Amino acid sequence: MIKAKPQDKYLGDILNEGGLTQSVKETINDRYGKAFNTINEIGAVINDFRINAIGGLKSGLDIFEMVVVPSILNNSDTWVQMDNGSINRLEELQNFMFKNLLAVPHSVPTPALRSELGCLSMEERINCRKLSFIYHVKSLGNSALANEIYELQRNFNLPGLVQECRKLISKYELPNIIDENVAMSRIQWKKIVKKTVGEHSGKLLLAKFEQYSKLRDGPLMEDGLSLKPYLKNLKLCEARTMFRIRTLMMPAKFNMKNDPRFASNLWKCDSCQRIDSQSHILWCPFFAPLREGKDVQNDKDLVEYFKKVFDIREKMEKEKIESCMNGSS
Protein backbone atom coordinates (compact mmCIF):
# COMPACT_ATOMS: atom_id res chain seq x y z
CA MET A 1 0.00 0.00 0.00
CA ILE A 2 1.33 3.41 -0.93
CA LYS A 3 0.91 6.00 1.80
CA ALA A 4 0.29 9.57 0.77
CA LYS A 5 2.51 12.19 2.38
CA PRO A 6 0.58 15.19 3.74
CA GLN A 7 3.46 17.48 2.74
CA ASP A 8 6.88 17.47 1.15
CA LYS A 9 9.71 19.91 0.47
CA TYR A 10 10.41 21.15 -3.05
CA LEU A 11 13.01 23.78 -3.96
CA GLY A 12 13.14 24.93 -0.34
CA ASP A 13 9.38 25.38 0.09
CA ILE A 14 6.92 23.10 1.85
CA LEU A 15 4.11 21.82 -0.37
CA ASN A 16 1.11 20.90 1.78
CA GLU A 17 -2.01 18.98 0.79
CA GLY A 18 -4.09 21.72 2.43
CA GLY A 19 -3.47 24.07 -0.48
CA LEU A 20 -1.51 27.25 -1.18
CA THR A 21 -2.34 29.05 2.07
CA GLN A 22 -1.29 26.09 4.21
CA SER A 23 1.84 25.54 2.11
CA VAL A 24 3.00 29.10 2.78
CA LYS A 25 2.24 28.72 6.48
CA GLU A 26 4.21 25.46 6.75
CA THR A 27 7.12 26.95 4.79
CA ILE A 28 7.35 29.87 7.23
CA ASN A 29 7.09 27.51 10.21
CA ASP A 30 9.90 25.39 8.78
CA ARG A 31 12.25 28.38 8.52
CA TYR A 32 11.14 30.32 11.60
CA GLY A 33 13.22 28.46 14.18
CA LYS A 34 16.48 28.81 12.24
CA ALA A 35 15.86 32.51 11.65
CA PHE A 36 15.02 33.04 15.34
CA ASN A 37 18.29 31.39 16.44
CA THR A 38 20.26 33.43 13.90
CA ILE A 39 18.77 36.64 15.29
CA ASN A 40 19.87 35.66 18.80
CA GLU A 41 23.37 34.97 17.48
CA ILE A 42 23.47 38.38 15.78
CA GLY A 43 22.49 40.00 19.08
CA ALA A 44 25.27 38.12 20.90
CA VAL A 45 27.87 39.20 18.32
CA ILE A 46 27.06 42.92 18.32
CA ASN A 47 26.71 42.99 22.12
CA ASP A 48 30.16 41.48 22.44
CA PHE A 49 32.87 43.29 20.50
CA ARG A 50 30.77 45.90 18.66
CA ILE A 51 29.09 47.37 21.74
CA ASN A 52 31.54 50.29 21.73
CA ALA A 53 32.11 50.44 17.97
CA ILE A 54 30.72 53.31 15.92
CA GLY A 55 28.00 52.02 13.63
CA GLY A 56 27.69 48.74 15.54
CA LEU A 57 23.91 48.82 15.33
CA LYS A 58 24.02 49.36 11.56
CA SER A 59 26.29 46.32 11.28
CA GLY A 60 23.70 44.18 13.06
CA LEU A 61 21.00 45.48 10.73
CA ASP A 62 23.16 44.70 7.68
CA ILE A 63 23.63 41.11 8.85
CA PHE A 64 19.87 40.76 9.28
CA GLU A 65 19.24 42.11 5.77
CA MET A 66 21.90 39.91 4.15
CA VAL A 67 21.36 36.67 6.10
CA VAL A 68 17.97 36.41 7.78
CA VAL A 69 15.68 38.16 5.28
CA PRO A 70 16.85 36.23 2.18
CA SER A 71 16.58 32.89 4.02
CA ILE A 72 13.10 33.44 5.48
CA LEU A 73 11.70 35.03 2.30
CA ASN A 74 13.29 32.67 -0.23
CA ASN A 75 10.76 32.04 -3.05
CA SER A 76 8.30 34.44 -1.40
CA ASP A 77 7.66 36.03 -4.80
CA THR A 78 5.60 32.92 -5.59
CA TRP A 79 3.68 32.81 -2.30
CA VAL A 80 0.04 33.39 -3.20
CA GLN A 81 -3.07 33.35 -1.02
CA MET A 82 -1.11 34.20 2.14
CA ASP A 83 -3.33 34.61 5.17
CA ASN A 84 -2.98 37.20 7.95
CA GLY A 85 -1.59 34.59 10.33
CA SER A 86 1.44 33.98 8.12
CA ILE A 87 2.00 37.70 7.59
CA ASN A 88 1.76 38.43 11.33
CA ARG A 89 4.26 35.67 12.11
CA LEU A 90 6.78 37.23 9.74
CA GLU A 91 6.17 40.70 11.20
CA GLU A 92 6.72 39.33 14.71
CA LEU A 93 10.06 37.87 13.63
CA GLN A 94 11.23 41.17 12.15
CA ASN A 95 10.06 43.13 15.20
CA PHE A 96 11.92 40.66 17.44
CA MET A 97 15.09 41.40 15.48
CA PHE A 98 14.63 45.15 15.77
CA LYS A 99 13.90 44.97 19.52
CA ASN A 100 16.97 42.79 19.95
CA LEU A 101 19.12 45.30 18.07
CA LEU A 102 17.82 48.31 19.99
CA ALA A 103 17.60 46.50 23.36
CA VAL A 104 14.08 47.76 24.05
CA PRO A 105 11.18 46.00 25.84
CA HIS A 106 8.16 44.50 24.12
CA SER A 107 6.13 47.55 25.16
CA VAL A 108 8.00 49.73 22.65
CA PRO A 109 5.69 51.36 20.05
CA THR A 110 6.33 49.01 17.12
CA PRO A 111 5.84 51.64 14.36
CA ALA A 112 8.88 53.47 15.74
CA LEU A 113 11.12 50.47 15.03
CA ARG A 114 10.67 50.49 11.26
CA SER A 115 10.56 54.28 11.11
CA GLU A 116 13.98 54.70 12.71
CA LEU A 117 15.62 51.75 10.93
CA GLY A 118 14.11 52.66 7.56
CA CYS A 119 12.77 49.17 6.83
CA LEU A 120 9.68 47.98 5.01
CA SER A 121 7.30 45.57 6.70
CA MET A 122 7.67 41.91 5.78
CA GLU A 123 4.43 42.06 3.81
CA GLU A 124 5.75 45.03 1.82
CA ARG A 125 9.03 43.21 1.18
CA ILE A 126 7.07 40.29 -0.28
CA ASN A 127 4.94 42.65 -2.35
CA CYS A 128 8.08 44.17 -3.88
CA ARG A 129 9.40 40.70 -4.70
CA LYS A 130 6.14 39.70 -6.36
CA LEU A 131 6.04 42.86 -8.46
CA SER A 132 9.64 42.30 -9.58
CA PHE A 133 8.93 38.66 -10.39
CA ILE A 134 5.82 39.41 -12.45
CA TYR A 135 7.94 41.73 -14.63
CA HIS A 136 10.44 38.91 -15.12
CA VAL A 137 7.76 36.37 -16.10
CA LYS A 138 6.11 38.89 -18.42
CA SER A 139 9.45 39.44 -20.18
CA LEU A 140 10.04 35.75 -20.91
CA GLY A 141 9.59 34.46 -24.43
CA ASN A 142 6.39 32.78 -25.60
CA SER A 143 8.12 29.39 -25.53
CA ALA A 144 8.61 29.56 -21.75
CA LEU A 145 6.10 27.61 -19.66
CA ALA A 146 6.03 30.36 -17.02
CA ASN A 147 5.03 32.91 -19.66
CA GLU A 148 2.32 30.59 -20.97
CA ILE A 149 0.79 30.29 -17.49
CA TYR A 150 1.14 34.05 -17.06
CA GLU A 151 -0.83 34.66 -20.26
CA LEU A 152 -3.58 32.25 -19.17
CA GLN A 153 -3.92 33.96 -15.78
CA ARG A 154 -3.87 37.38 -17.43
CA ASN A 155 -6.43 36.63 -20.16
CA PHE A 156 -8.92 34.77 -17.97
CA ASN A 157 -8.21 36.57 -14.65
CA LEU A 158 -7.50 33.25 -12.95
CA PRO A 159 -6.51 33.14 -9.26
CA GLY A 160 -2.76 33.34 -8.83
CA LEU A 161 0.21 35.66 -8.99
CA VAL A 162 -1.14 37.78 -11.86
CA GLN A 163 -4.38 38.50 -10.04
CA GLU A 164 -2.53 39.42 -6.84
CA CYS A 165 -0.11 41.68 -8.72
CA ARG A 166 -3.03 43.45 -10.41
CA LYS A 167 -4.29 44.33 -6.93
CA LEU A 168 -0.83 45.48 -5.84
CA ILE A 169 -0.45 47.68 -8.92
CA SER A 170 -3.81 49.27 -8.13
CA LYS A 171 -2.98 49.61 -4.43
CA TYR A 172 0.34 51.38 -5.01
CA GLU A 173 -0.87 53.23 -8.14
CA LEU A 174 1.92 51.80 -10.28
CA PRO A 175 2.06 51.68 -14.09
CA ASN A 176 -0.08 48.74 -15.23
CA ILE A 177 2.56 46.55 -16.86
CA ILE A 178 0.15 43.59 -16.93
CA ASP A 179 -2.71 44.96 -19.01
CA GLU A 180 -1.04 47.89 -20.76
CA ASN A 181 1.97 48.21 -23.05
CA VAL A 182 4.32 50.10 -20.73
CA ALA A 183 7.83 50.80 -22.02
CA MET A 184 10.01 50.35 -18.96
CA SER A 185 13.25 48.49 -18.28
CA ARG A 186 13.66 46.01 -15.43
CA ILE A 187 15.85 48.46 -13.49
CA GLN A 188 13.35 51.31 -13.96
CA TRP A 189 10.51 49.06 -12.78
CA LYS A 190 12.40 47.98 -9.66
CA LYS A 191 13.26 51.59 -8.81
CA ILE A 192 9.70 52.85 -9.16
CA VAL A 193 8.37 49.88 -7.15
CA LYS A 194 10.87 50.47 -4.35
CA LYS A 195 10.18 54.21 -4.26
CA THR A 196 6.37 53.90 -4.39
CA VAL A 197 6.10 51.10 -1.83
CA GLY A 198 8.45 53.01 0.49
CA GLU A 199 6.36 56.18 0.26
CA HIS A 200 3.16 54.20 0.86
CA SER A 201 4.76 52.51 3.89
CA GLY A 202 5.79 55.88 5.31
CA LYS A 203 2.22 57.17 5.08
CA LEU A 204 0.90 54.08 6.87
CA LEU A 205 3.43 54.62 9.66
CA LEU A 206 2.30 58.23 10.12
CA ALA A 207 -1.27 57.00 10.53
CA LYS A 208 -0.11 54.47 13.14
CA PHE A 209 1.85 57.17 15.00
CA GLU A 210 -1.45 58.91 15.71
CA GLN A 211 -2.42 55.95 17.91
CA TYR A 212 0.52 56.59 20.26
CA SER A 213 0.67 59.82 22.25
CA LYS A 214 4.45 59.45 22.60
CA LEU A 215 4.93 59.24 18.84
CA ARG A 216 2.44 61.79 17.53
CA ASP A 217 3.99 64.49 19.74
CA GLY A 218 7.58 63.51 18.99
CA PRO A 219 10.17 64.07 16.24
CA LEU A 220 9.33 60.87 14.37
CA MET A 221 6.28 62.49 12.76
CA GLU A 222 8.53 64.75 10.69
CA ASP A 223 11.43 62.45 9.82
CA GLY A 224 9.65 59.77 7.80
CA LEU A 225 10.73 56.24 6.94
CA SER A 226 14.52 56.24 6.64
CA LEU A 227 17.63 54.95 8.35
CA LYS A 228 18.46 57.71 10.81
CA PRO A 229 22.05 59.04 10.75
CA TYR A 230 22.66 58.46 14.48
CA LEU A 231 22.41 54.70 13.92
CA LYS A 232 25.54 54.90 11.75
CA ASN A 233 27.38 57.70 13.54
CA LEU A 234 27.08 56.65 17.19
CA LYS A 235 28.34 53.68 19.16
CA LEU A 236 25.86 50.86 19.68
CA CYS A 237 25.13 51.79 23.30
CA GLU A 238 24.76 55.47 22.35
CA ALA A 239 22.46 54.68 19.41
CA ARG A 240 20.22 52.65 21.71
CA THR A 241 19.98 55.54 24.14
CA MET A 242 19.23 57.95 21.29
CA PHE A 243 16.38 55.71 20.13
CA ARG A 244 14.88 55.82 23.62
CA ILE A 245 15.21 59.60 23.69
CA ARG A 246 13.49 60.03 20.33
CA THR A 247 10.64 57.68 21.26
CA LEU A 248 10.17 59.21 24.74
CA MET A 249 11.18 56.00 26.51
CA MET A 250 13.73 57.44 28.92
CA PRO A 251 12.85 56.83 32.61
CA ALA A 252 11.49 60.34 33.24
CA LYS A 253 8.57 60.21 35.68
CA PHE A 254 6.03 61.66 33.24
CA ASN A 255 6.94 58.93 30.75
CA MET A 256 5.63 56.46 33.35
CA LYS A 257 2.31 58.08 34.16
CA ASN A 258 0.71 54.88 35.44
CA ASP A 259 3.41 54.15 38.01
CA PRO A 260 1.82 54.82 41.44
CA ARG A 261 5.20 55.81 42.92
CA PHE A 262 5.34 58.87 40.69
CA ALA A 263 1.62 59.58 40.33
CA SER A 264 1.29 60.09 44.09
CA ASN A 265 3.75 62.99 43.83
CA LEU A 266 2.20 64.35 40.60
CA TRP A 267 5.30 63.27 38.66
CA LYS A 268 7.37 66.13 40.08
CA CYS A 269 11.12 66.33 39.61
CA ASP A 270 12.92 65.65 42.91
CA SER A 271 15.38 68.44 42.17
CA CYS A 272 13.21 71.39 41.03
CA GLN A 273 9.62 70.25 41.75
CA ARG A 274 8.51 70.79 38.14
CA ILE A 275 6.75 68.04 36.18
CA ASP A 276 9.47 65.58 35.27
CA SER A 277 8.84 65.16 31.55
CA GLN A 278 11.61 64.24 29.15
CA SER A 279 11.62 67.74 27.69
CA HIS A 280 11.94 69.16 31.21
CA ILE A 281 15.25 67.36 31.65
CA LEU A 282 16.69 69.49 28.84
CA TRP A 283 16.27 72.69 30.86
CA CYS A 284 16.10 71.48 34.50
CA PRO A 285 18.14 74.07 36.47
CA PHE A 286 19.59 71.39 38.75
CA PHE A 287 21.45 69.84 35.82
CA ALA A 288 22.52 73.13 34.21
CA PRO A 289 26.25 72.50 34.96
CA LEU A 290 26.06 69.30 32.91
CA ARG A 291 24.89 71.27 29.87
CA GLU A 292 27.82 73.67 29.90
CA GLY A 293 29.88 73.32 26.73
CA LYS A 294 27.38 70.92 25.18
CA ASP A 295 24.99 71.31 22.27
CA VAL A 296 21.81 69.38 23.06
CA GLN A 297 20.92 69.55 19.36
CA ASN A 298 23.94 67.34 18.70
CA ASP A 299 23.14 63.62 19.00
CA LYS A 300 26.35 62.65 20.77
CA ASP A 301 26.19 65.54 23.27
CA LEU A 302 22.51 64.84 23.93
CA VAL A 303 23.16 61.16 24.66
CA GLU A 304 26.08 61.98 26.98
CA TYR A 305 23.97 64.56 28.82
CA PHE A 306 21.04 62.18 29.39
CA LYS A 307 23.40 59.43 30.52
CA LYS A 308 24.98 61.69 33.14
CA VAL A 309 21.57 62.92 34.32
CA PHE A 310 20.25 59.44 34.96
CA ASP A 311 23.53 58.30 36.50
CA ILE A 312 23.16 61.12 39.03
CA ARG A 313 19.50 60.31 39.61
CA GLU A 314 20.30 56.65 40.18
CA LYS A 315 22.99 57.58 42.68
CA MET A 316 20.62 59.97 44.50
CA GLU A 317 17.94 57.26 44.64
CA LYS A 318 20.39 54.78 46.17
CA GLU A 319 21.47 57.32 48.78
CA LYS A 320 17.82 58.02 49.58
CA ILE A 321 17.10 54.32 50.09
CA GLU A 322 20.20 53.85 52.25
CA SER A 323 19.23 56.87 54.35
CA CYS A 324 15.73 55.47 54.92
CA MET A 325 17.15 52.08 55.89
CA ASN A 326 19.61 53.64 58.34
CA GLY A 327 16.85 55.79 59.83
CA SER A 328 14.53 52.85 60.36
CA SER A 329 17.27 50.84 62.04
Spans of features found by a protein language model:
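Short, amphipathic alpha-helical segments
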Residues: 31, 51-54, 75, 195-208, ...
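Acidic catalytic cores of enzymes that act on phosphate-bearing nucleotides/polynucleotides
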Residues: 86-89, 93-246
